Amino acid sequence: SLEVAYDTQEEVYTAMFTELDDVIASLQDNLSLPSDAFGRYDGVYSGNISQWLKFANSLKLRMAMRLTEVKPDLAKSKAAEAIAAGVITTNADNAMMHTSDNRTTLIYNDWGDHRIGADIINYMNGYNDPRREKMFTTVTLVENGQEIQGYAGIRIGINVTSKAQTVSSYSNMRVTGTDPYLWMNAAEATFLRAEYELRWGSAETAGTLYEQAVTLSFEE
């Protein structure tokens, strides 16, 4: 059928908030359990339920701040709930799935289907951002007639005529087979808190949180 009924975005978000609140309540009910109760099967936090709670609240905060332009009252109330309950604030609590076989290496390193966009590369190049070394691979560039190693991003929508030539001309994500899958980190949660303060709280607090988020990103 060409007339399939779809849930509205509002219905989807409402259901997601309900499910997430149910999960948070369940986690809170099990806070007293020792970490070894779930640790064997938990590749993210090794059974630490307090850390799972921080991640769940951080997800709620992320969802809430995506509603600021369409449901500002709901965004504010849900974000306030999440912040009050406690979100990720340190890199030690970052949500990462640990693995000995990160399969995204197939996408980035083997198949060569992805390269870094010019927008982020140009921005970070402009600030000589030291995080590039940890995030991206280098490529050979020509500057003043000399070959150098640097970072180059590909423009969105560019016409790729030769994949082999293209993949060697632009920087890639730096990913190894033992890298964890990052789901959410303290920097993102802190940037979201800064946005919350900027919209509904204190501009001074927003500035402080913004700087904290930048620091957390560099420390990571």
Give the predicted meaning of each segment:
Residues 1-220:
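Structured, solvent-exposed acidic/aromatic patches
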